[in-house]
Amino acid sequence: MLSRLFAVLVFFVAIPSSVFAMTTCGGEVACSVRGGDYHIELPSDGDLRGVYVFFHGYKSSAKLQMLQRRLVDMTLAHHLAYVAVDGIEGSWSFPNSPQSGRDEKAFIADVFQDLHNRYGFSPDKTVIGGFSIGASMAWYTACQQGERTRAMVTFSGVFWNPLPKAADCVAAIPPIIHFHGTAEQTFPLSGRAIGTRFRQGNAFESIAIMRSRGKCDVAIARKVTLDGIQCDDVPRCIRGDSVMCIHNGGHEARADMLDAALTAIGFPR
C-alpha cells in the first residue's frame, strides 16, 4: 500500500505545474498569459468549431465584456468560443494610441498560443474582432500578425493617425468585415482628434490600406447585403473578401450584425 501511495505521489510531483495551470481557467476564472489575461466561454453543447477573440472598447475590461450577453450568446450560437481579451487600464497600447505600457503584439501572440495550447485553436479557426478602440486593436493585429487569424469582424474602430503604410502590414491580411455608422460620433468615419496629440484614423483610408496590401481587386467591387445593410465587397484578395458595411446608426456593435458576419465568413449557426 505504501509503495503504491509513494508511486502516486512521485507521479504528481513529476508533472510540471504548467500542466495543472492549463486546466484552471474559464468561466469566471481568467486565463493568464505573460503580460495579461483573457476570459473564455465555450458552447454548452460541446460543438466547438473555432474561437472569436474580441478586444473590448474604451474603459471596459474582459470581465465586463463577458456581460455583453447578446454578443457572447450569438458567438456561441455559431459554435465558436467567445474570448474577451483584457486591455490595460481600459484601453490598448497599439501604435499611435494614447495608451502605452505593454507590447500588445507580443501579448496577443501569447494569447493566440495559449488558446492553441489549451483548446487546440489553430489560425484557421481563429476570428478576431473588437469594438471602438478595441476594433482598432483588432486592425493592428490583422496588420501585424494576420497569418494567425482566419478572419476579422469589427465594429466602429480602425487605424489611428499616422496610418500605417500597406508595406507595414503582413501580406496575409485576413478576410475583413467591418461595420461603421454614419451617425457615429465617438469614432466617426473620418476619425477625430483625441486631445492635442492623437487622432483616430479615417475608416475608408484604413480599409484601402488593407485592400492594397491584400491585393484585392477594387475594379470588380460589388454590393452585398449583411443584416439589411448594403456593404461594399472587394473580392479576390490574397485570402478572401474585404467588406465594409456602412449603416445609419451610431457607436454600436449589434448581435444581428455579428450573426450575419460570422455566417458570411464560414461559421453558420
Regions found by a protein language model. Name each.
Residues 5-15:
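Sec-dependent N-terminal signal peptides
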Residues 19-51, 100, 126-153, 159, ...:
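A domain-start/cap signature at the N-terminus of enzymes
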Residues 24-123, 127, 137-140, 144:
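Serine-hydrolase catalytic machinery in alpha/beta-hydrolase-like enzymes
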Residues 63-67, 94-96, 140-141, 164-166, ...:
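Short, solvent-exposed loop/turn and secondary-structure capping segments
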Residues 171-176, 238-242:
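Short, proline-enriched alpha-helix->beta-strand connector loops that line the catalytic pocket
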Residues 178-180:
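Short beta-strand/loop motif that positions the catalytic acidic residue
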Residues 182-240:
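Active-site-adjacent alpha-helix of alpha/beta-hydrolase-fold enzymes
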